[in-house]
C-alpha cells in the first residue's frame, strides 16, 4: 500500500505541476492539517485515492468556508480503510487565545479517552494520524510547537505501527528527522509531502486488543 502524507505547506510539485501520472500508484493520501481547503480539493481531481485529513491549528477557515469537498475528515475517529485502522487526532497544544483546534493536555486526553471503545471495536489501531507530534519526540522548543505528552501514553498503550504528524516544519531545525522510530512505531513528519509504503493489512494476523480501559487519567 503506497501512502502520500502531506502537511502544513502545499508542495509546489503537487500544487503547480500535479497530474494523474504524478499520483499514479498512490493508494491513500493522509493530510496532517494546516493546508488550504482548495489545495486538498485540487488534489482530488488527479487521483481516485481517498484523502483523509485531520485539522491543524491554522484550519479555522474550514469552519467558515466549509470542510474540503471530496475528502474525509477522520478527526476524533477510528477510520478503517481496506483493513488499515487509522486514529485521527488533529489540533495543536493551546498556546494563545484562539479557540480553533487548540487543546490543553487535559482536553486532548479527554478526546483520546472518547476514542477508546472505537479502537477496541476495531481491534486496535495501525496508524495514528495527528497534526502535532508527541512531547519530546521531534517537537519544537517554543510553546506553540510543543507536542502532547498524552500522545506518548497512546503510543505505549496502543502501539500503532505508524505515527504520522506535521506541525513542526523540517526547516525549523536541520536536526529534525523526517522519519524515526519510537519503540515499535515508525514516526513520520509529513511536512509538505512524504511518500511511504506499508504492507497490505492482514486482519487475520491482528492481535487481540486489550479490554481494560487504558490508563489515560484526566490530568493537567
Where are these regions (language model features)?
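A generic local structural motif
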Residues: 14-20, 37-41, 72-74, 113-117, ...
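Active-site neighborhood of phospho(di)ester-bond hydrolases with catalytic His/Asp-centered motifs
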Residues: 5-7, 28-34, 52-57, 74, ...
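Conserved catalytic scaffold of divalent metal-dependent phosphoesterases
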Residues: 5-14, 58-146, 192, 213-216
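Conserved beta-strand segments of alpha/beta enzyme cores
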Residues: 2, 50-52, 72, 85, ...
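A short, gly/pro- and small-residue-rich
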Residues: 47-58, 148-151
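N-terminal active-site segment of His-dependent metallophosphoesterases
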Residues: 1-46, 116-124, 220
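Binuclear metal-dependent phosphoesterase catalytic core
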Residues: 6, 65, 78-82, 154-158, ...
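Active-site environment of divalent metal-dependent phosphoester hydrolases
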Residues: 10-14, 35-41, 57-64, 94-98, ...
Amino acid at each position: 500500500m503506497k501512502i502520500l502524507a502531506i502537511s502544513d505547506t502545499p508542495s509546489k510539485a503537487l500544487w503547480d505541476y500535479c497530474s494523474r501520472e504524478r499520483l499514479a500508484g498512490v493508494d491513500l493520501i493522509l493530510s496532517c492539517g494546516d493546508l488550504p481547503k482548495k489545495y486538498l480539493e485540487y488534489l482530488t481531481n488527479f487521483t481516485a485515492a481517498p484523502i483523509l485529513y485531520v485539522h491543524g491549528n491554522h484550519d479555522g477557515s474550514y469552519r467558515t468556508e466549509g470542510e474540503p469537498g471530496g475528502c474525509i475528515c477522520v478527526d476524533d475517529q477510528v477510520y478503517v480503510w481496506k483493513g488499515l485502522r487509522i486514529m485521527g487526532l488533529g489540533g495543536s497544544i493551546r498556546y494563545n487565545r484562539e479557540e480553533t483546534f487548540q487543546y490543553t493536555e487535559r482536553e486532548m486526553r479527554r478526546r483520546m479517552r472518547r476514542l477508546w471503545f472505537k479502537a477496541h471495536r476495531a481491534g486496535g489501531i495501525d496508524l495514528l494520524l495527528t497534526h502535532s507530534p508527541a512531547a519530546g519526540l521531534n517537537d519544537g522548543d517554543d510553546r506553540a510547537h510543543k507536542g502532547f505528552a498524552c500522545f506518548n501514553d497512546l503510543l505505549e498503550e496502543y502501539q500503532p505501527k505508524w505515527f504520522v504528524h506535521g506541525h513542526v516544519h523540517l526547516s525549523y531545525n536541520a536536526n529534525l528527522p523526517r522519519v524515526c522510530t519510537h519503540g515499535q512505531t515508525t514516526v513520520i513528519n509529513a511536512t509538505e509531502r512524504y511518500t511511504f509504503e506499508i504492507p497490505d493489512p492482514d486482519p487475520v494476523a491482528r492481535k487481540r486488543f486489550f479490554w481494560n480501559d487504558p490508563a489515560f487519567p484526566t490530568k493537567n
